[in-house]
Amino acid sequence: MSKKYVYMFSEGNAGMRNLLGGKGANLAEMTNLGLPVPYGFTISTEACTEYNEGGKKLTDEMIDQIEVALAKLEEIAGKKLGDPENPLLVSVRSGARASMPGMMDTVLNLGLNDISVEGLAKKTGNTRFAYDSYRRFIMMFADVVIGVSKSKFERKLDEYKESVGAKYDTDLTAEDLKKVTAIFKQIYLDDQGKEFPQNPKEQLLEAAMAVFRSWDNPRAFVYRRMNDIPYSWGTAVNVQMMVFGNMGNTSGTGVAFTRNAATGEKAMLGEYLVNAQGEDVVAGVQIGRAHV
């Protein structure tokens, strides 16, 4: 019997932390409790270990199981990755069995390309949102998956904002963001000598491998050593339907804690940003930041 590397959220539970990582196990548990969790699947920590010890390659068996899980996710969502009319977009996140906040990598809005971005714009009636998501994806993918410095994109974005008199990202119009997207694609082309990848399944596999590699990045290495986390544990990869915080002023993103991190007081504490995505909170963007 072939080894199982990929688990739909409905196939796991909280007791499978070693295999699915903390995030994957808890997402599975919440799914099985009937909570409204955006659906997805988890690629196991065992796949990570075999990837890193086997020449940094996904086996054919792993790829086959990822494709089967993706097909199930598409069926549940009623959308397809890369579809020109109703595209499915996913996030790709790490999830080790021990909490390692900020140590490993995340890719959001995966599945966008030059065709599906137009489908997203038409489906949502929000062209600005579609191109905001695409330019974010290009920068994240280039940085996390390929290793193109994020600062190259941030510098060009700042230059563009200055040229049009925009103080904040949220001041940019749909047409502005189309131009920023083209600028970002050119940065990728200049750096890599090839166009930004347009095949969504290729994007997904590359992002999953990048998360596996991030288990061994310098930040994660130091954190593991400081916290006695064995290398052999590996990290899982969680692929989940996107929920968007950047669709306008009625959406947002945030973090919440059950205790005050500074004092230890048992009280809810958090902060959020309106019309933003999760990485903006982590990156320390201050505009629109509110505390709860």
What are these regions (language model features)?
Residues 1-289:
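Nucleotide/phosphate-binding sheet-loop regions of phosphoryl- and nucleotidyl-transfer enzymes
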